[in-house]
């Protein structure tokens, strides 16, 4: 029987990063993955392929709507080749997953393909695709099995017309009318992809606003921008049935007045979040306990109820984000090596990769009000930037929330071009407990989108933004 210092079940961003860090720290490491490719949801059917589709569809939209204004004239009709677009997406996925294989080899990590299940707290059975079972032993084990799309109890996912994000990334045709159930990150990103390609898109959301977990100002601005892009929204609608009839899908929902509303389309994307994936893990055999939501219970060091077993990523509490899982994977590896790492969960940024992009870190205005914290806010519009006007990306703003007395930055919320990258500046500043004045006095290159961060900091510092 092969023996290891650490075995990791699941090869998503949390699992493979944990494996690499463990190996770097001198531990004999194994990783177990049930699929034939490494990388988990993120690399195979999540973050990476959805960004590939977002970029491809963005190019198409620019070519059909914006090139002429830039003085670029393309003779003839511009067409979408969806098959080729999806093939390119798959090539990006293939390159990325092969890159993870390379990293496993480079770091001398043993990879097992199959379903890993606990025999006890130190032994894992690996059921391979050919039906054979192999057993390994590990001093420490990390559960990194991730999540899968959630649904509603009354919805039957046929994966043809009533689909999840996985199927939405490999459709054979552009929908005529895609109805998206859920106004969160996944629904909005994939809804925007197919809207750009020519589909009619209607987003049906139970809450009274989209991206409800983010600052209300971001929700309001993104709604306004996406309505301008002709995406339709049915907010405060409670879906009660989804029925397929041939090539049509009929969705019935009650609006906020309790009146029934019927939506008809040829595809329904169910994007109501994700849930922990622990099927077949047999965690009870190792003494691992779960909460009422099916998440693995861990302490502040991410240790489970079993002394040598840890859990990271989507299977435990907190935001279901790839970069959160990566930080947790690194943290556990370093704890096992006797180090004292830390994660500030308040400083894990959240991003929506629509265009304009939406990004945030720290506290929202709603959270500060609820906690009774006295704060000041500074906001700066993207349209006031020369760089934004040059690129025609004028939607959005940057908002900085700072403590009224100390000026420490408590939250940064932004929507606009390249905000997914800009948010890193805010994370860095907040990690070092910067004040709004600190950011306002840093030189930002001109002309850039990042100048909006400086200007918002100026606005939060005695309301002295320069360019509005």
Language-model features: locations:
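Beta1/beta-strand and adjacent pyrophosphate-binding region of the FAD-binding site
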Residues: 1-12, 174-184
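Glycine-rich flavin
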Residues: 1-4, 20-174, 202, 207-211, ...
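Flexible, glycine-rich terminal cap/loop adjacent to redox cofactors
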Residues: 7-14, 18-35, 48, 53-59, ...
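Short hydrophobic core segments
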Residues: 7-9, 116, 135-146, 181, ...
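N-terminal Rossmann-fold NAD(P) dinucleotide-binding loop
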Residues: 15, 187-188
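Gly/Ala-rich phosphate-binding loop of Rossmann-like dinucleotide-binding domains
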Residues: 19, 23, 191, 195-196
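FAD-site-proximal beta/loop scaffold in flavoenzymes
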Residues: 155-175, 262-336, 440
């Amino acid at each position: 029987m092969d023996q290891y210092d650490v075995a990791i079940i699941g090869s998503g961003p949390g699992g493979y990063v944990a494996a690499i860090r463990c190996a770097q720290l001198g531990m004999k490491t194994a990783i177990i993955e049930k699929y034939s490719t490494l990388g988990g949801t993120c690399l195979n059917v999540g973050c990476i392929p959805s960004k590939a589709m977002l970029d491809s569809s963005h190019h198409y939209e620019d070519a059909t709507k914006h090139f002429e204004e830039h003085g670029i004239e393309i003779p003839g009709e511009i067409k979408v080749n969806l098959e080729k677009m999806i093939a390119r997406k798959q090539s990006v996925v293939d390159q990325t997953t092969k890159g993870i294989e390379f990293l496993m080899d480079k770091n001398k990590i043993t990879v097992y393909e199959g379903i890993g299940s606990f025999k006890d707290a130190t032994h894992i059975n690996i059921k391979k695709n050919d039906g054979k079972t192999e057993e390994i032993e590990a001093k420490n084990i990390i559960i990194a099995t991730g999540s899968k799309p959630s649904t509603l109890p009354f919805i039957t996912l046929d994966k043809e017309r009533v689909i999840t994000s996985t199927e939405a990334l490999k459709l054979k045709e552009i929908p005529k009318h895609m109805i998206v159930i859920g106004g969160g990150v996944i629904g909005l990103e994939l809804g925007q992809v197919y809207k750009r390609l020519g589909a009619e898109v209607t987003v049906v959301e139970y809450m009274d606003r989209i991206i409800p977990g983010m600052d209300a100002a971001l929700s309001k601005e993104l709604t306004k921008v996406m309505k301008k892009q002709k995406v339709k929204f049915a907010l405060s609608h409670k879906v009660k049935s989804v029925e397929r009839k041939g090539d049509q899908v009929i969705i019935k929902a009650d609006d906020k007045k309790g009146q029934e509303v019927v939506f008809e389309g040829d595809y329904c994307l169910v994007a109501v979040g994700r849930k922990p994936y622990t099927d077949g893990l047999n965690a009870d055999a190792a003494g691992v306990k779960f909460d009422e939501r099916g998440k693995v219970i861990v302490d502040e060091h991410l240790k489970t109820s079993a002394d040598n077993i840890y859990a990271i990523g989507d299977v435990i509490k907190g935001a279901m984000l790839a970069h959160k899982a990566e930080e947790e994977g690194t943290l556990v590896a370093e704890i096992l090596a006797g180090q004292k790492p830390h994660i500030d969960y308040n400083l894990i940024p959240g991003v929506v990769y629509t265009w304009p992009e939406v990004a945030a870190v720290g506290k929202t205005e709603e959270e500060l009000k609820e906690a009774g914290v006295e704060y000041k806010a500074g906001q700066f519009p993207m349209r006031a930037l020369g760089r934004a006007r040059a690129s025609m990306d004028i939607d959005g703003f940057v908002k900085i929330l700072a403590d009224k007395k100390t000026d420490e930055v408590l939250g940064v919320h932004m929507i606009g071009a390249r905000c997914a990258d800009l948010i890193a500046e805010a994370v860095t500043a907040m990690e070092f407990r910067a004040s709004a004045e600190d950011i306002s006095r840093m030189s930002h290159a001109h002309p850039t989108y990042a100048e909006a961060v400086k200007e918002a900091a100026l606005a939060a510092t005695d309301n002295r933004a320069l360019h509005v």
